[in-house]
Structure formats: C-alpha cells, structure tokens
C-alpha cells in the first residue's frame, strides 16, 4: 500500500456504489479472452487435472543453464558498490519519467512492496522470491501501473552487475535502498532470490475483469474472503484504497485491511507500521482524466517495448502523470523519514473529496494547511491529502490506539516499521540458511528457526546400528513410513516452510493435526525418543542424533526393509544434520496454515471435503515440489507400504502389504477389474472382478486418477511394466529422499 495503489471508479452520486463498468478504473480496460481463440485441452475438459502444473520452470527455459550457481556468482558481488549505484539511479531524474521531488525513492518502495506483498499464507504462493513482477499478469495488474518504469530505471544496474545480482533480488533491494537513502534505518536485508524465466500460473482470482470482487466473496451476507486469496480485489495487492468496492468508508476499509494483511502474516501493529511507514514517502498520481491512459504492458503496442499505460494527458509524465487516479502527497517531507505522516493524519480534520481523475480521497477540512505540502516539480504548495485507507488508521478502533501511541513515541514506530518491512521483504524466502549477504540479522520467530548443530554427527556405522535398533523396536513399516512422511510432508516449496528439520512433528500444533494421526504418534514417538536418548547417552566422541534426524532415518530403514521384502537390495541415502526446535521457537498460529486439508499421498481428506480429491493431490504434490513421475511413483509406493491414513485399505492393491512392489500399478491397470462408485461410502470406489462380480479392491479418486487421467496413466504404465519393477524401487527411493531432504537447504 505504499505510494500509488490502483483506484477504482468512485461511487456515483446517486447510488454511492462503485461503477459497474467493464473496469472500475477507466484507465485500465479489462482484457477478455478472444472468443475466436483456438480452444485448448483445458477449454474442452476443464475438470481434468493439469499435470503440467508440476513442471512450472523447465530447465530448457533458463538461459543461464542448469549448472548456474547464483550463490557462487553472488559471492563475487560488491554489495556496497551495488547499493551506491542503486541510490545514484534513485537520485538521478530521467526526462522520460521524471522523479517526484528529484528522488525515485517512493516509486522504488512501491515496486519492492508490490513484489513482496503478493505473498499469501494459505498456500505460500506469491512474494518477491522469483522476480515474478517482470511477467504477466503481475506486470500488468492495475495495482502495478508505472512499476514498469521503476524496473526500466534499474536496467543499467542489472546490466552492469549481470549474473551476480538477480532481478528478484534487485527489485526487492531497491526498496530497501530507498528507505536508507531517505534517512530510515532498516532492520537488515538478505539476498538469495533466484530468477525464473517465465510466468507461473497462480490462481489470483476467478473474476474475469480487473478490480472485480464478486467471485472471492461468496455472497452469504458476511464479507468473508475466500481462501486462498490474499487480496480483496482482482488485480490489487491488498485492498481498494478508495474503500471496499470503491465506497469511501474508512471503517469498512479497516476491516478489509486487517483481513488482507493478516493473510500476509502481519498482525495489527505490523499492518499499521507498514502503512504509516510506506506512506511517509512519495506520492500517488492522478493528475487528470484516467481515460487518457493507454493499455497495460502486455497489451501495449510492440513499439513501446514492454512499457505500458502511456498517457496522452498533457506530457503524460511528471506533473501530468496518472498512475492510480489518486492524487495524494501524505507529508510535507516526502523524501525524508520522520513522523510527519502521523502528525498530519492527527493534525487536521478531514473531508471527502475527489482527485482530478475522479477518485475518492480526503483533504484537510475547510482549507486547513493549504500550501504546506510541497509540489513535486516546484509548483505552488498543496493542501494535505490522505487516502481513504489512511483515514482508517485514525477512525478505526483496530488501529487508532496503535497509531496514537506512535504519534507520541516515534521511536516505537521506527522499530515496528523496520521489523515489519524486513518481514514483508523476506516472508516468502524460508529459513535464514537460504539467505545471502552481509546484512542478515538474527533469525526471527516467523522464520521458523532451528538451532545450529552443536555436536559431531553420526557416521555410517552409527546409522547402520540405529537402523537395526529401529527395525527391532516393534514398530511396523507402515508406522515408520507414515511418521517420516508426516514430518517431511509438511514442506511447502512455495515459501520454503515446513519439513522434517526442527523435529516439530513432536510439538504443537503438528502433533495434533488430524492428518498426522496423533494417537499413532503417541505410540511411535516415545519409542524413537528412547532410541535417541540411549544412543546420545552412550555414543563416543560426543556424537548425537536429533529426533528430527532419527524420524527420517527410521522411515528410510523401513523403506529399505520393504524393498528387501520385495526382492531388492537398495540403500536409502541419509544425510544427518537436522536439529530439534523448541516449542518456544514455534509460532503455533503461524504453523496452523500448514495443516493439510487433504493429503492424497496418505489417502487422507478431512471429513466433508468438497474439492475433488485428485485436484487436492496435485496441489499437495505441487507444494512438495515433486514432478509428475515422482508423484506417481510415490503414491504407488506408499500404497504398497501401507502408509494410508488410519490404516485404510483404499488403493492398497496388493496381497503383499509392507513390501515395496509395483502391485499398485499392475492391479490398477488390470482390465479384469471393473470400477464403480460405492453405494454405501462417500468418495469411495469399488473394484469388482469382471467375471465373478466379487469385490477385489476399494479406492478413492487419489488412486483411480492414475488410471483415468491420460497423462498419469501413461506414467503408471511405465511402473506396471514387467521390466520396470527395479526402476520402480529406484525411482521411489529417489523421490522419497527428495521429499525427506526438501528443507535441507544446507545440502543444496
């Protein structure tokens, strides 16, 4: 919400509600699919799962090659020189896009904010970690008008430093530099974001017009934002700055603010700090008729070379710029950090007005403060102005107490903004082990910290001895496999959270998640803890093993035994080095969003789940970062191992449960079986012998999709072949190790 945010057309005087025009911002015509475009498979069969989603960034698309190591290149970078060059760009105004007040700081803050601010907690998608703002749809969102210019201003810096700095890092770093150049002391900064080279399909909303809201609010009478969305409005980062659906109601806007910032993992104080801090700099742009603004970058003529929103109002730039349609300068010191945002907010009474572009905003009442706000290009002074969402900070009891306290204690605001800004920029990056550079501060609670290894690790002999103890403990193969999967399977590749490291399976809230079968964990974990304690008490040389490591090792031992029982000798790679986090270093509320509503790998779904199970399986595979073949072999192997939730027999197509066989695929593809939906159990299918009618198997959609979907059937056929039983075991073990090590960034 810093600097410009996209405006919607203001409510019409006779109704007080937002316009129902094609796009609420008249400057941004809403694009529509061409009616005569060739139909895709998705158009013809929209309910089929799209396995290609599991391969979003193919190696062939990367011009730097598979061997490129960003961390290695970054190590060659002079970060102080980079900072100096970014600040130089920021303070050197260009005629083709003149800088407000001679400083692009506000623009760069908005660019960084709008890159990082797409992050959402429910599925970990969004954020600035891959440089996605360069691509559609983000590069053409109404909320990102003119950020194409910000990135273009940075091109000389990117060109100079080349592969040593990614676009993803540079976009985020520029905003941090902007704050520092204007006198703000930041909390820290980490590099380490690697670029991708093509856009990723993310469901930002089901609306088919910019600034639509109808599909994300179910219309039940309650304003309840559907999951997993993080914004109230299609094409905006958070909320409509004019108020919900363009109705200028600061109290209603505050409710939306709280919801959307909460979905980005921000509490009330962090939310207020970000708004106050971000709006302490720069201005918004709504100099004239927004109908004179041209199409977004993706729809702009080829000769504009990737720049969009070309305006024919006056010069189209500088004093004539139109970005959001709002024309607000928040403070008398727009290029300097101080407390004048709050001094201005509370120093005047406010009345509703409209910008020159017709957008709702507030101005100081009765002409108070006229001339106290400087013009960005040396013109006459202006009156104080605020967005509807700024007034929310004063009028809403949610934020009033917080901001009034900061009015009297600006040092508390500075501290809160520094930490909230750091969190905003880094929330999607995962643990600090992924961070690069000299300015990384100590780990924060929201980063799910794990302690460092402070002891010698187990060696190969220790690993072998521990495997023997685990297998002799009385715990079964399914118990050991399910426990390891419960730990490692919590990982989300989107925001690098979850996983086995930290041993948080033994802590709240994960220990009580329904998917993890708490009653089973109560049987398994004490046995593993006793093995751990006995080893740590007797091992030579101070060697120790964490419970996090032992959980993974025990699952790997079970896989080896299951392979041996199927006739194959194979070693499952194990890399020690995980540590055990404490309950105090685990934010229970933050971890709650990781709880799976379904996990098709374990054939689990919460009772009453309405979404198609096969779609939820694909989503779980996406979050784990596994490919189509890996998802296929994992499901088949886990069924053979008996790793279903609750010991269910659905999909266990074998008379040798516990042995790592390819029986799942062989029997699924057997044409001697006829499948029908069960008449007695919801979401269950029954496989009957075609000749006798006898019941042979039961299954869910998580199982049958591998015979139904043409892409997955092709993969299943590979693993069902007589000559690929060994390949099945090898591929399962490789995929298993990948999942177990997903969060071991120290190994990568």
Curated annotation (Swiss-Prot):
Disulfide bonds: none annotated. It catalyses: H2O2 + AH2 = A + 2 H2O; 2 H2O2 = O2 + 2 H2O. The active site is at residue 114. One of its GO terms (biological process) is hydrogen peroxide catabolic process. PROSITE patterns: PEROXIDASE_1, PEROXIDASE_2, PEROXIDASE_4. GO terms for molecular function: catalase activity; heme binding; metal ion binding. There is a cross-link at residues 113-238 (Tryptophyl-tyrosyl-methioninium (Trp-Tyr) (with M-264)). It is an enzyme of class 1 (oxidoreductase). The keyword Oxidoreductase applies. Formation of the three residue Trp-Tyr-Met cross-link is important for the catalase, but not the peroxidase activity of the enzyme. GO terms for cellular component: cytosol. The record marks 110 as: Transition state stabilizer. Residues 1-20 have a biased composition (Polar residues). It holds the Pfam family peroxidase. SUPFAM superfamilies: Heme-dependent peroxidases (SSF48113). Keywords: Heme, Hydrogen peroxide, Iron, Metal-binding, Oxidoreductase, Peroxidase. Belongs to the peroxidase family. Peroxidase/catalase subfamily. HAMAP family: Catal_peroxid. Bifunctional enzyme with both catalase and broad-spectrum peroxidase activity. Homodimer or homotetramer. This is Catalase-peroxidase. It comes from Mycobacterium avium (strain 104). The lineage of its organism: Bacteria, Bacillati, Actinomycetota, Actinomycetes, Mycobacteriales. The gene is katG.
């Amino acid at each position: 919400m810093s600097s410009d945010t996209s405006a919607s057309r203001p409510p019409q005087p006779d109704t007080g509600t937002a316009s129902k025009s094609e796009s609420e911002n008249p400057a941004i015509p809403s694009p529509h699919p061409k009616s005569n475009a060739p139909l895709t498979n998705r158009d013809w069969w929209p309910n089929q799962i799209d396995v290609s989603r599991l391969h979003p960034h193919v190696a062939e698309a990367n011009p730097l090659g598979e061997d490129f190591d960003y961390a290695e290149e970054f190590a060659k970078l002079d970060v102080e020189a980079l900072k100096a060059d970014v600040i130089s760009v920021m303070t050197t105004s260009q005629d083709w896009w003149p800088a407000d007040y001679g400083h692009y700081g506000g623009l760069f803050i908005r660019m960084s904010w709008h890159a990082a601010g797409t992050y959402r907690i429910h599925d970990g998608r969004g954020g600035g970690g891959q440089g996605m703002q360069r691509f559609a749809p983000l590069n053409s969102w109404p909320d990102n008008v003119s950020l194409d210019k910000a990135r273009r201003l940075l091109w000389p810096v990117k060109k100079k430093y080349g592969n040593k700095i990614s676009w993803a890092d540079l976009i985020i770093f520029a905003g941090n530099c902007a704050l520092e150049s204007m006198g703000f002391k930041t909390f820290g900064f980490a590099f380490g974001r690697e670029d991708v080279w093509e856009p990723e399909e993310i469901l930002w909303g089901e609306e088919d017009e910019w600034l639509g809201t109808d599909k994300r609010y179910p219309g039940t009478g309650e304003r309840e934002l559907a999951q997993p969305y993080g914004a109230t409005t299609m094409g905006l980062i958070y909320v409509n700055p004019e108020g919900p659906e363009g109705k200028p109601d600061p109290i209603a806007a505050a409710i939306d603010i709280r919801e959307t910032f909460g979905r980005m993992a921000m509490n009330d104080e962090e939310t207020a700090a970000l708004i106050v801090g971000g709006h302490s700099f720069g201005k918004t742009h709504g100099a004239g008729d927004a109908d004179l603004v041209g199409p977004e970058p993706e729809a702009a003529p080829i000769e504009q070379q990737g720049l969009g929103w070309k305006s024919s109002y006056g010069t189209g730039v500088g004093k004539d710029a139109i970005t959001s349609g709002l024309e607000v300068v928040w403070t008398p010191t727009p290029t300097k950090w101080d407390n004048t945002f709050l001094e201005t907010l509370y120093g005047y009474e406010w009345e509703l007005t409209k910008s020159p572009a017709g957008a709702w905003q507030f101005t100081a009442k009765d002409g108070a403060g006229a001339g106290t706000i400087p013009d960005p290009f040396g013109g006459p002074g202006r009156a104080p102005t605020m967005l509807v969402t700024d007034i929310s900070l004063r009028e809403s009891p949610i934020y009033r107490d917080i901001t009034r306290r900061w009015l009297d204690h600006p040092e508390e605001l500075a501290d809160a903004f520094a930490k909230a800004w750091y969190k905003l920029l880094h929330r999607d990056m995962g643990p600090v082990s992924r961070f690069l550079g000299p300015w990384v501060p100590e780990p924060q609670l929201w980063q799910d910290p794990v302690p460092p290894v402070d002891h010698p690790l187990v060696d190969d002999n220790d690993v072998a001895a521990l495997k023997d103890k685990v297998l002799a403990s009385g715990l079964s193969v399914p118990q050991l496999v399910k426990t390891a999967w419960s730990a490692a399977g919590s990982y989300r590749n989107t925001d690098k959270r979850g996983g086995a490291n930290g041993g948080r399976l033994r802590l709240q809230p994960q220990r009580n998640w329904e998917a993890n079968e708490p009653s089973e964990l109560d049987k398994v974990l004490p046995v593993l803890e006793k093995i751990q304690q006995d080893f740590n008490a007797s091992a030579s040389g101070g060697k120790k093993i964490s419970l996090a490591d032992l959980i993974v090792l025990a699952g790997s031992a079970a896989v080896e035994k299951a392979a041996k029982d199927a006739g194959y000798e194979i070693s499952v790679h194990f890399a020690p080095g995980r540590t055990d986090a404490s309950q105090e270093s685990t934010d229970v509320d933050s971890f709650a969003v990781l709880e799976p509503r379904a996990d098709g790998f374990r054939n689990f779904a919460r009772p009453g789940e309405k979404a198609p199970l096969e779609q939820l399986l694909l989503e779980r595979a996406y979050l784990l970062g596994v490919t189509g073949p890996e998802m296929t072999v994992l499901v088949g192997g886990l069924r053979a191992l008996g790793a279903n939730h609750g010991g269910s027999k659905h999909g266990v197509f074998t008379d040798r449960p516990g042995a790592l066989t390819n029986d799942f695929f062989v029997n699924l593809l057997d044409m001697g079986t006829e499948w029908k939906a069960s008449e007695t159990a919801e979401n269950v299918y029954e496989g009957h012998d075609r000749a006798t009618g006898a019941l042979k198997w039961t299954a869910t959609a998580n199982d049958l999709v591998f015979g139904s979907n043409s892409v997955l059937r092709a993969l299943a056929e590979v693993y069902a072949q007589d000559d690929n039983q060994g390949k099945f075991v090898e591929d399962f073990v490789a995929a298993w190790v990948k999942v177990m090590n997903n969060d071991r960034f120290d190994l990568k």
